[in-house]
Amino acid sequence: MGDSRDSRSPDSSSVSSPPSGQRSPPLAPSAAAMTSLPPITSAVNSPISSMGSPFSVISSSLGSPCLPGTPSVGYGPISSPQINSTVSMSGLHAVSSSDDVKPPFGLKPLSSHSPGPMVSQKRLCAICGDRSSGKHYGVYSCEGCKGFFKRTVRKDLSYTCRDNKDCLVDKRQRNRCQYCRYQKCLAMGMKREVVQDERQRSVQEERQRNKERDGEVESSSAANEEMPVEKILEAEMAVEQKTELHADGSSGGSSPNDPVTNICQAADKQLFTLVEWAKRIPHFSELSLDDQVILLRAGWNELLIASFSHRSITVKDGILLATGLHVHRNSAHSAGVGAIFDRESAHNAEVGAIFDRVLTELVSKMRDMQMDKTELGCLRAIILFNPDAKGLSSPSEVELLREKVYASLEAYCKQRYPDQQGRFAKLLLRLPALRSIGLKCLEHLFFFKLIGDTPIDTFLMEMLEAPHQLT
């Protein structure tokens, strides 16, 4: 008896015999058969164990059915034909991944892998079974059923069923019977009051937006009262009339062969009208006299360039001076320009380059956007109220006036050109070009032959102290 035990393989000792009083499994192998079959553990560890999901499902679900030392499964020898068939090689080959292998009664199956979080979170529409896009009106539903229920409640629609009011509502047939679909929405828990509350909120939001728009209109009208664009336009028109009078009386004596001289003469005459224009701009005369002089001295060149650039919109490849003369691009590049610049002939190219910049960066842009005189006047008022001018006694007051012009111009653009949302920004983008070109013109053009030998500060002071000279 002891010799027979010693002659068995080591693994066969792990196979326990059934306790006394219990019937042996009908298919349990005999000792002779055990010696001819490979050990169970070796079968588990053999390449067959890597066959795939069928074997792993069986082994993980049941453990080692023939081993009594397995603590996790509190069962004795199991006589299930399913389990006994797994011992034989032929039984292993008969199992496929599609077979429904069930554990013994009372044994909870253990899946080989737990479902991922995305799988567990997928929900279907409670009405038609399509993929749910979330919880709508109290029920997980798809976008189609959500929209159907929303339209039905908001429009207070009523439907009738052509059959027995028990139509199938699924993903394919949900549009066949609107009555049954709506009844199923209600039956699954969709709430009409949620749709109605949503409608009320949207109405309230629309009212709030209307109030905000009304507030914008009120604020823009308030800004216009503080800096009325009508007054700014009046100042522009008064200066334009004065310019036309100058042009009628003095155009005959100018020489078109000397464009720089013509420009300087135009600047000379325009300084008189510029001071009159500034006096007509709202709140400018309320500043101290010294601050008025500082602002005009800091911005007069940009103010004049803005004026003749806008005046030249109708001229092709040239500018129209206040004297009424046209200066063509070719004239600015001609040799006659160098007559004033005897000391440095290099200035010829500089003057031609400045002229080209005026045409491309100012005249052309103003023409393309069809800048009107009100917008021109507001841009010039922004240039005039320069809080960065050196020597101001009250720069904060000047900055406040500039901000009022900004607000009035923006309100004017919204009211006059409602379809051009970027127009206000386009207008402001002309200011850097005016600044840059103005600095270049100061270097090369306008100080020549300017009001004789009179210092510009003295001239401006006398003009500002004088009463209005434009009628």
UniProtKB/Swiss-Prot annotation:
InterPro entries assigned: NHR-like_dom_sf, Nuc_recep-AF1, Nucl_hrmn_rcpt_lig-bd, Nuclear_hormone_rcpt_NR2, Nuclear_hrmn_rcpt, Retinoid-X_rcpt/HNF4, Znf_hrmn_rcpt, Znf_NHR/GATA
PROSITE patterns named among the record's database cross-references: NR_LBD, NUCLEAR_REC_DBD_1, NUCLEAR_REC_DBD_2
Location of the region described as Hinge in the Swiss-Prot/TrEMBL record: 198-221
Entry text on domains: Composed of three domains: a modulating N-terminal domain, a DNA-binding domain and a C-terminal ligand-binding domain.
GO BP terms: cell differentiation; negative regulation of DNA-templated transcription; nervous system development; positive regulation of transcription by RNA polymerase II; regulation of DNA-templated transcription; retinoic acid receptor signaling pathway
One term of GO molecular function: retinoic acid-responsive element binding
UniProt main location, coarse: nucleus
UniProt xrefs under SUPFAM superfamilies: Glucocorticoid receptor-like (DNA-binding domain), Nuclear receptor ligand-binding domain
Matching SMART domains: HOLI, ZnF_C4
Annotated region (Modulating), positions in chain: 1-102
Keyword Nucleus attached: yes
Biological role stated in the UniProt entry: Receptor for retinoic acid. Retinoic acid receptors bind as heterodimers to their target response elements in response to their ligands, all-trans or 9-cis retinoic acid, and regulate gene expression in various biological processes. The rar/rxr heterodimers bind to the retinoic acid response elements (RARE) composed of tandem 5'-AGGTCA-3' sites known as DR1-DR5. The high affinity ligand for rxrs is 9-cis retinoic acid.
Location of region: Disordered: 1-34, 196-226
Compartments, record wording: Nucleus
Protein name, per record: Retinoic acid receptor RXR-beta-A
Taxonomic source organism: Danio rerio (Zebrafish)
Gene that produces this protein: rxrba
Keywords: Activator, DNA-binding, Metal-binding, Nucleus, Receptor, Transcription, Transcription regulation, Zinc, Zinc-finger
Disulphide bridges: none
Span of domain NR LBD: 224-467
